[in-house]
């Protein structure tokens, strides 16, 4: 029985699911805002900011898991190198902190399809997420193993798990051809699964996503 964590670090939201591999999963969704502590002001009434998650990023204190408009003089990341930014690392640490665990057997995370198809980018993220992480001054979390998937696959796996004990006609087999579309804030991603395999030539990423529509 291992402890498993799923993290989807998006441009708008941080979504995590965690629990033992043979038990129920807890799910949490937080906004994907993250910036150094000094970019956040205090409340007008003097009360504590109780929705702040304080995490360590390379020795600097960050606030993570808040709305992107809460940080002053700090722009949100909207580019392909998002996964290499300090804000992304802060959200990763926030996700680990929210699990309340000190050791995780398997962490599953995703990349946009175009980045997932780059083996070097997949391996770089896997290596960075594996091992010990000093998420706060007092807490270190050890991640034993990491699996990187194409982001839309998470929705498909959730559906497979949901219908596993349901009617036979609802279950997915290798005979099915499945298109999964994941409309995000920065990118629109899609995957085609056929014969139980991700069809790389029919899967991809478009940057004409929600952020473009809102401009």
Please report, for each region that a protein language model flagged, where it lies by residue.
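Hydrophobic, aromatic-enriched interface-forming segments
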Residues: 177-194
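Nucleotide/phosphate-binding catalytic cleft detector across ATP-hydrolyzing
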Residues: 1-178, 197-210, 215
């Amino acid at each position: 029985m291992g402890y498993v964590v799923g993290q989807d670090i998006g441009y708008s939201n941080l979504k995590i699911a965690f629990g033992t591999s043979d038990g129920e999963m807890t799910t949490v969704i937080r906004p994907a805002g993250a910036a150094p502590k000094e970019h956040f002001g205090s409340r007008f009434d003097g009360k504590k900011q109780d929705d702040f998650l304080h995490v360590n990023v390379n020795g600097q204190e960050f606030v993570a898991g808040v709305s992107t408009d809460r940080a002053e003089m700090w722009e949100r990341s909207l580019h392909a190198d998002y996964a290499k930014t300090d804000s992304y690392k802060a959200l990763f640490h926030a996700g680990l902190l929210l699990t309340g665990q000190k050791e995780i057997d398997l962490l599953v995370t995703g990349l946009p399809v175009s980045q997932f198809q780059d083996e070097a980018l997949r391996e770089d993220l896997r290596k960075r997420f594996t091992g010990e992480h000093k998420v706060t001054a007092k807490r270190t979390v050890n991640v034993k193993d990491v699996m990187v998937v194409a982001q839309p696959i998470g929705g498909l796996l959730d559906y497979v798990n949901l219908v596993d004990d349901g009617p036979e006609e609802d279950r997915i087999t290798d005979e099915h051809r499945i298109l999964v579309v994941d409309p995000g804030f920065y990118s629109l991603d899609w995957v085609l699964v056929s014969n139980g395999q991700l069809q790389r030539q029919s899967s991809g990423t478009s940057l004409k996503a929600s952020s473009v529509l809102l401009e």
